[in-house]
C-alpha cells in the first residue's frame, strides 16, 4: 500500500473527527489570515483553523493529484501543546499522530 493510499482515509476522517470534537468551522478565515508565512499560521489562525483551511486542503490536493507527499514532518507535537488542556480533542490528536506516522 502506498503512502497516499494510507493517508487518504486519514484525511477523509479528519473533518468528521474535528466536527465530533467541535473544532470544525463553517466560515473560512479571511484571505489575509490565510496568507501568513509563519509556521502553522500562528500569527493569524487558531490551530484548528490551520488544520482545516491550510493543512487538509493542501494534503488532499497532493494525494488527489498524485504529487509527492511531504516526508519527515511531525505536526502532532504542535497540536498536543496547543490543546494540552483540552482532553476532548484527544480523537483529533490521535488521528494527527497517525498522519505523522504515515508521512515519516
Question: Where in this protein do the model-derived segments appear?
Answer:
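N-terminal intrinsically disordered, cationic/polar leader segments
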Residues: 2-34, 38, 73-76, 84-99
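A generic short-segment signal for beta-strand/edge and adjacent turn/coil regions
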Residues: 18-21, 47, 67
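Amphipathic, interaction-prone secondary-structure segments
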Residues: 38-52
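Mid-chain, well-packed structural core segment of small domains
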Residues: 51-78
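Short hydrophobic/aromatic patches at helix-to-coil boundaries
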Residues: 100-104
